[in-house]
C-alpha cells in the first residue's frame, strides 16, 4: 500500500482489534458496523478516487443520519514527520484533495480529523509521486507500531474524549 493509503490502514487496524468486518459494499464505500466497547461505530473506506472521497462520506452520513460531529476522517499528512499523529477539528484542506472533497460535499469542515504523518518527499521528488510510493524499509519496520498507536488514539477519542487523546498521543514539536 502507498503512503496515501495510511488512513485505510489505520481503519483496517481498528477493524482488526475491534473484530469489525469491513465487507459491505454500498455508498461507494466498503464499510462495516460494530462496537468499540460500548460505542457503536461505522468504519468506512471510500472506494472512489481520493479526490472524490466526499461523495462516499456524504452518502454514508446521509443514510445513517450522521452529522459532521459524528465523523472522524483518518488521512495522511505530508507536513507531519513520519509517524506523528495530530488531531484537528475544523480548518482547511491543507492541500489534501480527499479532505477538500469531503469539506465540499459535507458543506462544512467541522468533522474531526486524525492526521497521520508521512513526512516530506526527498529533495527532487515530486509530492504526488511520493504519496503514491510505498513505504521504504525503515518506515515499513515502524508501520505496525504507528498503526496500533493511531487505532488506540481513535478508541480513546470515542471512549474518553478528544482532549484525553490529544494529551496522550499528540507529541509536541
Describe these PLM feature segments.
Residues 95-98:
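Hydrophobic alpha-helical segments within soluble ligand-binding/sensing domains
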Residues 1-90, 100-114, 121-126, 133, ...:
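Nucleotide and nucleotide-moiety/phosphate-recognizing core
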